[in-house]
Amino acid sequence: MGNELQHRTVLLDEAVESLVTRPDGIYVDGTFGRGGHSRAVLARLAPGGRLIAFDKDPRAIETAQGIEDARFSIVHDSFASMRDALAARGVEKVSGVLLDLGVSSPQVDDPARGFSFRADGPLDMRMDPTRGESAAEWLARASVQELTEVIRDYGEERFAFQIAKALVARRAESDRLGPLDTTGELAQIVGHVVKTREKGKDPATRTFQAIRIHVNQELADLQVVLDAALSLLEQGGRLVVISFHSLEDRIVKRFMQAHASAPAVDRRLPIRAVDLPSPPLKIISRQFPSEAEVAANPRARSAVMRIAERVTP
């Protein structure tokens, strides 16, 4: 219960105000979490409105099942399954899609989930602990090259190769030391390699982020759900995405810009601008948490919210 109370939804009012443009529409919350955005969306919907939420985390599903509202339903799956899941429910078009990316405070603050380097726990990091390969299982088999690529590309860590070598060297000692299966030991290994210090950031931050992204296929799933959202949005429907690190935000920014721009055409060709297809999206805005919100919830500091609207049928 304590963890539930600690979670604060970032950009709550701003996101829901941007999302809900038609109170009787069908909306999707791709990341239910602990339900902050979903409850606020339901409060704005008319009796004929509908909200379908997604989450991989079994604890999020438990929380969602406590919402007694006929307009609401929850899907225990990744938002990457959105297109098929909505089709199975007879939904062809929606009025808005909300994505609040990253991990929630209850996930980070629970050592048993293995997301945090601040408290020792099992090295898991899966959003859904019942499916897929845990961080410990992946670390037990990954090559130096694969480890380097993941830590470099998903953590933007300049010491990726050195960290990868240290992890493989530790694995060679498994017969004597046992498997590398705790967050505390992983953080310690990284700390011994990363000698430089970024102000206010633990040396293990980038490596933990990278492994979490890899284990959960976060960036691949994000690209899938953005494509799905574009095809599902009705004319006038909104796509609202809140991201918390540069890799996510870069993907969202490029996606929105690509679909809000007219297609490139060779100027030497006899094609008029009016003959080109209209881009499907219009970028509405980019927003950041207020100083007051960041003061109340420091984890909101890195949040960026991007909003786009479908302008073509």
From Swiss-Prot:
Among its keywords, does the record have S-adenosyl-L-methionine? yes
* Localisation per UniProt entry: Cytoplasm
Where do the annotations place S-adenosyl-L-methionine binding?
35-37, 55, 79, 100, 107
What keywords does the record list, in alphabetical order?
Answer: Cytoplasm, Methyltransferase, rRNA processing, S-adenosyl-L-methionine, Transferase
What's the EC number here?
2.1.1.199
Gene Ontology CC annotation, any one: cytoplasm
State the reactions this protein catalyses: cytidine(1402) in 16S rRNA + S-adenosyl-L-methionine = N(4)-methylcytidine(1402) in 16S rRNA + S-adenosyl-L-homocysteine + H(+)
Q: Which GO terms describe its molecular function?
A: rRNA (cytosine-N4-)-methyltransferase activity
Q: Does the keyword Flavoprotein apply?
A: no
Q: Which domain of life, per UniProt?
A: Bacteria
What is any one GO biological process for this UniProt entry? rRNA base methylation
Just give the chief location class. cytoplasm
What Gene3D superfamilies would the database entry show?
A: Putative methyltransferase TM0872, insert domain (1.10.150.170), Vaccinia Virus protein VP39 (3.40.50.150)
Q: What does this protein do?
A: Specifically methylates the N4 position of cytidine in position 1402 (C1402) of 16S rRNA.
Similarity remark: Belongs to the methyltransferase superfamily. RsmH family.
Which NCBIfam families does the entry mention?
16S rRNA (cytosine(1402)-N(4))-methyltransferase RsmH
PANTHER family listed in its UniProt record:
12S RRNA N4-METHYLCYTIDINE METHYLTRANSFERASE, S-ADENOSYL-METHYLTRANSFERASE MRAW
Q: Please give the name of this protein.
A: Ribosomal RNA small subunit methyltransferase H
